[in-house]
Amino acid sequence: MKLIVALGNPGLKYEKTKHNTGFMALDHYLDEKGLRLDRDKFTALYAKEKVAGEDVIFMEPQTYMNESGRAVGAAAKFFKIDPSDILVIHDDMDMPIAKLRIRAGGKSGGHNGIKSIIACLGTEKFNRLKIGIRHPDKQSVVSWVLTPFNPDQQKELEASFAKVDQIIDDFIAGKDAQYLMNRYN
């Protein structure tokens, strides 16, 4: 069983903000597959689906970003999912807008959602799909991540979602992190 987690903040206020890039990417994937998050448990919206013969949990925690680990930890424990079978999709401001990078474990890189997941899982050994949102020039980091993309940036971001969909499909199909990094990084 795989667990695909998208990070973001709940509520309409944050819906199109840079910090919700993970939610936007997973929502695109689910729309393309005709799936929806139809369950509410673990302080998260989730769906349990069969994709390409594999049982998959798709999840969007409904806590604020820095509490995301609670939902991920609870779901991983409940469904008995090994951290190596978890893929977390999240924003990364150390990369240009829409740039994608896969990592197999490692530190949080200062991302509070990832810090929370590491703390709740008790390990750094889970997979991440980072989506670039660019570092703010002179704007504060908090204000940058909590504002929407401008129309050109939004277009660029949405153009990357087809590749995100391929990465998710490959992960579900059992391609390991090394394969994904070699193919997509």
From Swiss-Prot:
EC number per UniProt: 3.1.1.29
Residues that bind tRNA: Y14, Y64, N66, N112
UniProt cross-references to PROSITE patterns, sorted A to Z: PEPT_TRNA_HYDROL_1 (PS01195)
Active-site residues, record numbering mapped to chain: H19
Location(s) in or outside the cell: Cytoplasm
Keyword field: Cytoplasm, Hydrolase, RNA-binding, tRNA-binding
Domain of life of the organism encoding this protein: Bacteria
A GO CC annotation given for this chain: cytoplasm
Residues of the site described as Stabilizes the basic form of H active site to accept a proton: D91
Annotated site location: Discriminates between blocked and unblocked aminoacyl-tRNA: N9
Cross-referenced CDD domains: PTH
GO biological process entries: protein quality control for misfolded or incompletely synthesized proteins; rescue of stalled ribosome
Catalytic activity: an N-acyl-L-alpha-aminoacyl-tRNA + H2O = an N-acyl-L-amino acid + a tRNA + H(+)
A GO molecular-function annotation: peptidyl-tRNA hydrolase activity
Pfam families: Pept_tRNA_hydro (PF01195)
Role summary: Hydrolyzes ribosome-free peptidyl-tRNAs (with 1 or more amino acids incorporated), which drop off the ribosome during protein synthesis, or as a result of ribosome stalling.
NCBIfam families recorded: pth
HAMAP family xref list: Pept_tRNA_hydro_bact (MF_00083)
Family designation: Belongs to the PTH family.
Oligomer and partners: Monomer.
Protein name stated in the entry: Peptidyl-tRNA hydrolase
Native species: Lactobacillus delbrueckii subsp. bulgaricus (strain ATCC 11842 / DSM 20081 / BCRC 10696 / JCM 1002 / NBRC 13953 / NCIMB 11778 / NCTC 12712 / WDCM 00102 / Lb 14)
